[in-house]
Amino acid sequence: MSAHNRGTELDLSWISKIQVNHPAVLRRAEQIQARRTVKKEWQAAWLLKAVTFIDLTTLSGDDTSSNIQRLCYKAKYPIREDLLKALNMHDKGITTAAVCVYPARVCDAVKALKAAGCNIPVASVAAGFPAGQTHLKTRLEEIRLAVEDGATEIDVVINRSLVLTGQWEALYDEIRQFRKACGEAHLKTILATGELGTLTNVYKASMIAMMAGSDFIKTSTGKETVNATFPVAIVMLRAIRDFFWKTGNKIGFKPAGGIRSAKDSLAWLSLVKEELGDEWLKPELFRIGASTLLSDIERQIYHHVTGRYAAYHDLPMS
């Protein structure tokens, strides 16, 4: 991943001037979604590229060490080898970008990946995921413990009430403490945009998170009623672009929640390419949080190679 974002001083004068043009954002989202994202002959290559952006995730109450092992195996071998050979991509080292688990499962993931002989990063959700409604002291300790157990990326959740009540300085201070607790681990800040009320709040929260030292800003926990949407993403991507123009710091973007199909993944790649350019299309600056997306990508690649759709037994690890 890229170098840490060390953050900037809080600039409330900038925050106070922000006002998002909601109808214009919706029009832009409709324009992008109406286009064909990738020509058919290029789809397999783009789908393989999408695989390398996935934070392969399991965040279930019934997670065990055995299904964490399966997750890590799939992260290392995301696409069946014979399919990769058919595309002449079997020797390119294609893996997912990371695995993402609960803090209590970090040790399991680190152990499984070490046994598999690969250096895929382990990301952990933390800071009272998914609601962010536990005591700050507890949230900070959760981050520290996840890092201590071997997580090199931490996906924290913000306290949404600070956004809804306009407590921007308190939000900045909270994320600064998260940044410090992460140490050398990279910080991804989940805004839970479906619970922020307005697109203006989404932009302001994005900017505060970047000022406070977030290496990535992330749309959602995946547990909200409304998760990653194009209008929200456009606002966040414009905030990333504005922050880059102002500071020279490139901040990553991670949509998560409801991204399940190969077609969805291509649409998200196209959106990031349109709004930020090709330089953001690398795992250091773009991730997709997903648990079932990889299965559909592998099915589509199977169809591209064989001309038929896979039966369940054809892709048993999906």
From Swiss-Prot:
GO molecular function, one term: deoxyribose-phosphate aldolase activity
Disulfide bonds: none
Subcellular location: Cytoplasm; Cytoplasmic granule; Nucleus
Active site: 155, 218, 254
Major location category of this protein: cytoplasm
GO CC field: cytosol; extracellular region; ficolin-1-rich granule lumen; nucleoplasm; secretory granule lumen
Stored Pfam families: DeoC
Descriptive protein name: Deoxyribose-phosphate aldolase
Gene name in the database record: DERA
